[in-house]
């Protein structure tokens, strides 16, 4: 596992911050009346994370890498006392505006997650992260230690992510790069990935042909690295799941649409894990 000093870490994460700031307007341009959707009782969460989370009513929950806060506010509606943390300015500004407009109670912090977890005095019953989160972080061990620090004794980490195996394949489904990769992957920037299935409030054409002017850096963690970092941080793994479908995201061409805004592998392809879930207790 590659190691980065604090200066390198900040440089990598700050570049990702700029890239996410550049992409946020394009992402939200495709989502119709998000505040109205939430005020009417709408929920942006998928059944799988709700099943892993269980009943959150009355719990203190930190949403790690919360992006624009739609899922955070969906959890607040379910009774959780929600704190959201994200490195990028534009998503946090949007989340705060959405919370004010919906009158759903949640607190949002703009910070590098590593810095925030190392210094926050707050403690939580649940630390939650989902869909495209840990692949933006340059040190998985530091992430897991930070999660352990902000959890109360008996608190839970709940993680639902795209399976690391999928990043070895191109959109065509052809094997494109090794599963085992070390170091930072220099990429073209956060893309505009928001389609119909990521806009439950209603999809709009919005920004067309978005090209991000800011590059980004990704990190390809294996399942073993994720589990080992969790264990090494002192968290006790309780649940591990693999799913043969992807929520809200057409990862490959010709994927099969399924109920619940899911996609399965193309009919001509063998089944493979497309997401995984993890619950670990402090």
List the predicted regions and their residue ranges.
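Conserved class I S-adenosyl-L-methionine
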Residues: 156-203
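Short alpha-helix
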Residues: 217-240
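Class I SAM-dependent methyltransferase SAM/SAH-binding core
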Residues: 59-116
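A short acidic, Gly/Pro-enriched loop at the edge of an enzyme's catalytic core
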Residues: 114-127
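N-terminal, positively charged/glycine-rich alpha-helical extensions of SAM-dependent methyltransferases
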Residues: 1-35
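A short SAM/SAH-binding and catalytic strip from SAM-dependent methyltransferases
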Residues: 125-141
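A short glycine-rich, Lys/Arg-flanked "PGG" loop and its adjoining helix->strand segment in the class I
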Residues: 141-156
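Conserved alpha-helix/loop element of class I SAM-dependent methyltransferases that forms part
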Residues: 32-60
